[in-house]
Amino acid sequence: MEKKGRVIGIGEALWDVLPEGKKLGGAPANFAFHAKQMGLDSIAISALGNDDLGDETIAAFDEKELTYLMPRVDYPTGTVQVKLDENGVPAYDIKTNVAWDNIPLTDEMREIARDARAVCWGSLAQRNDVSRNTIHDFVKLTPDNCLR
């Protein structure tokens, strides 16, 4: 018997700005992408700014055919500036008060939660009350048999 339901990554979707260029990242978004690569019905949930990086994020997810739910909010799309020291050891400057710090709980998210098979979230997106409350409320809406 095949299990139904979605595998969900909820939390940060951001751009890692590396010396050689930017790369789309965020652990929950990466989790949803890899679940899709394994043939699972997955979705990445976050928030994006009303800016060029938000548009680029949507284009990248569309190109990878990854399902996403990312409301546009009045904060910039998240970035992490990555600098390497002389030994190649990275230092990270994670920008604050960005879109994924302010993920709103939407009606569509509530619906998705009720059909969740598994949900993954990290600690980073919980640094702000708005996203932390959204993640906690989302998880509470998932079925009892959902892997959390």
Question: What residue ranges belong to the model's regions?
Answer:
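Short phosphate-engaging motifs
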Residues: L53, T77, P90
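Glycine-rich phosphate/adenosyl-contacting loop at the front of the ribokinase-like
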Residues: M1-L66, V80
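Gly/Ser-rich phosphate-binding catalytic loop and adjacent alpha/beta segment
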Residues: P71-G78
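Ribokinase/PfkB-type carbohydrate-kinase core domain
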Residues: M1-I8, A60-D62, Y68-P71, E86-R148
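Short beta->alpha junction loops/turns
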Residues: A47-N50, D74, L124
